[in-house]
Amino acid sequence: AMAICMSAIAPVLYTTKAKPFSYNKSNMNSEINKKIISIVKSTGITYIYGEDFWRMQLLNSIDAEVHSSELTDAYDKFVIPRTWLSRPSWYCINGEVLYYTKDGKADKIIESELKSKNGKILYNGAEGKIWLGPVIWSKPKWCN
C-alpha cells in the first residue's frame, strides 16, 4: 500500500500547481549540453558524473553516446555513487571520465578531488564546468 501511495505522489503533484520539477524548464539545447556532446565526441569518453539527479539523468536523453550518473556527498568529505535509477555498471569504470559541476555540496567535493588529482577543466561557463579526470569514488563491491 505504501508503494502505491508513493508512486501516486508525482502524478498528483503534476496535476496541481505544486510542480517540483518541470521538464519544460530544461533546455536540452543549452550551451553546456552542446558542450557535453562536443566533448564526448572529441574525447571518446562517454561517461559523465555530477551532483543532482535531475541534472545528470536528463543528460542521458541528449545523445545516445552520453552515459551520465549521479554522485552524492558522504559525510561532507567524499562522494559516493547514487545508484537509484542509475546503471550500477556505470560506476565500475576505469580510466578517465568526465564530470559536470555547478555549485552544490557534492560538486565542491568533486572539484576539490579533481584539483588534487590533476583533473582538467575542459569547459567553464555560466551553467557549470566540465572536467576531465580520474574516477574519484571507491568502486562499489558489485564491480569485482
Please name every model-derived segment.
Residues K77-W90:
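Alpha-helical scaffolding within the catalytic cores
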Residues S42-D76:
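Short periplasmic/luminal acceptor-recognition loop of GT-C membrane glycosyltransferases, typified by
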Residues A18-Y23:
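Surface-exposed cleft-lining segments at the edges of enzyme active sites
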Residues G44-E51, I93-D103:
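Short hydrophobic beta-strand segments
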